[in-house]
């Protein structure tokens, strides 16, 4: 395995300087503060600036279609993360836009994709239902055909970014009598349609997500993606991307795991805890040194786990490491970012509050472990039926 640094040409270095200057200009401390206060993980001014500068289109497109070359793509990804660009809404937008490009009509592609590249059109995910849990195929939101339109009724949970988006990538049930994977149809529903109500929810880590209600929402058939009852085919690729079940590129110029953005918060928290222990002298206590070393080792190991394995390893490490850091640092570590007296400027507190959610986003840890067991280890499906009680 080659661990040498990739060679940067003069043009690559100029691009690095350009990106750093651009991000420093637009991702200001005020932007970061506002993002913490709203929990949106989105800033419209920054997003539109990224679109106007051509960065969104270059990130979305392949190199063959005019996107970033591999080295510059990696530079862009790393610098965007270092600058703490509010990114979640662009993540869902880029993911859904690929389904629009693959399954949408030419008219729909022309309506949506130019705005995606300029930043004026954002797309969110309408997957989870209040009673659906992690199994998105158990969809109860109904779409009933009425001539050239569809009437949609139902509700979705955790539609993050809906209040900042123009369309939702919506799973609907169009044949309740069919098997669940044969009953789904996907739509790209305009969020300004009559009958849509968006209600905000704040999660324990401070992020905002949404419940979205659909009451007799009429959607033209041109907003359908793929075949009627063929939604699982449309949905499979974005689900694989969200799960991290994608093949790695052989050049190594990419994140090892899909959860790297979140993992960096954990790495920073461990570094800060170790620095505080070093300054206070508590690291001389062998139990403290051991726990810090264990935390660092867990972080390092999880950062090196690829694909869907990394998603599980990072989420579990965050759940295990964060309470240990809080215990080592004491009560002042419970103060959030920007609070006077926070021992580590809120790093451990944020990871502690974020950790439970990492094991839920995009599917639970149990779902991912089952996927690894079935598709990697070749084991059978788990049996959740109650044990048979033998009677004499």
What label would you give each PLM region?
Residues 5, 71, 76, 236-237, ...:
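Glycine-rich phosphate/cofactor-binding loops in nucleotide/flavin-utilizing enzymes
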Residues 148, 153-197:
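A short core secondary-structure module
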Residues 1-90, 111, 115, 337-340, ...:
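Amphipathic, small/basic residue-rich leader segments at the start of a protein or domain
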Residues 119-127:
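A short, Trp-centered hydrophobic/proline-enriched beta-strand micro-motif
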Residues 51-119, 160-167, 299, 303-310, ...:
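Internal helix-loop-helix
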Residues 31-38, 282, 286-289, 293-343:
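C-terminal helix-coil-helix/basic helical segment that borders enzyme active sites and/or dimer interfaces
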Residues 4-8, 197-302, 358, 391-392:
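Glycine-rich beta->alpha junctions and the first turn(s) of the following alpha-helix
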Residues 141-144:
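A structural signal for short hydrophobic beta-strand segments in well-ordered beta-sheet cores
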């Amino acid at each position: 395995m080659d661990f040498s640094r990739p060679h940067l040409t003069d043009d690559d270095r100029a691009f690095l300087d350009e990106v750093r200057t651009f991000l420093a200009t637009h991702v200001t401390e005020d932007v970061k503060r506002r993002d913490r206060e709203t929990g949106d993980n989105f800033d419209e001014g920054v997003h539109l600036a990224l679109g106007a500068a051509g960065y969104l289109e270059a990130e979305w497109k392949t190199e063959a279609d005019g996107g970033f070359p591999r080295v510059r793509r990696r530079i862009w990804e790393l610098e965007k993360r270092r600058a703490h660009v509010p990114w979640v809404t662009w993540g869902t937008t880029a993911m859904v836009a690929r389904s629009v490009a693959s399954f949408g009509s030419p008219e729909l592609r022309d309506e949506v994709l130019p705005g995606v590249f300029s930043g004026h059109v954002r797309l969110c995910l309408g997957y989870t239902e209040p009673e659906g849990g992690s199994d998105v195929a158990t969809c109860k939101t109904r779409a009933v055909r009425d001539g050239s339109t569809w009437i949609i009724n139902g509700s979705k949970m955790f539609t993050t970014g809906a209040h900042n988006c123009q369309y939702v990538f919506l799973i609907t049930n169009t044949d309740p009598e069919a098997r669940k994977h044969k009953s789904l149809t996907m739509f790209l529903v305009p969020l300004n349609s009559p009958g849509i109500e968006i209600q905000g929810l704040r999660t324990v880590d401070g992020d905002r997500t949404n419940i979205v209600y659909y009451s007799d929402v009429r959607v033209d058939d041109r907003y359908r993606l793929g075949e009627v009852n063929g939604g699982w085919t449309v949905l499979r690729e974005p689900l694989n991307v969200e799960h991290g079940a994608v093949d790695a590129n052989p050049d190594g110029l990419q994140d090892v795991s899909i959860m790297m953005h979140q993992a960096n918060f954990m790495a920073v928290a461990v570094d800060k805890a170790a620095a505080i222990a070093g300054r206070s002298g508590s690291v001389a206590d062998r139990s403290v040194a051991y726990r810090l070393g264990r935390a660092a080792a867990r972080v390092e190991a999880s950062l090196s786990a690829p694909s869907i394995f990394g998603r599980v390893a990072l989420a579990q490490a965050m759940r295990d490491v964060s309470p240990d850091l809080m215990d080592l640092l004491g009560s002042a570590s419970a103060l959030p970012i920007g609070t006077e007296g926070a021992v580590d400027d809120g790093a451990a507190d944020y990871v502690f509050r974020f950790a439970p959610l990492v094991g839920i986003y995009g599917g639970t840890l149990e779902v991912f472990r089952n996927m690894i067991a079935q598709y990697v280890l070749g084991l059978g499906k788990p049996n959740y039926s109650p044990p048979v009680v033998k009677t004499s």
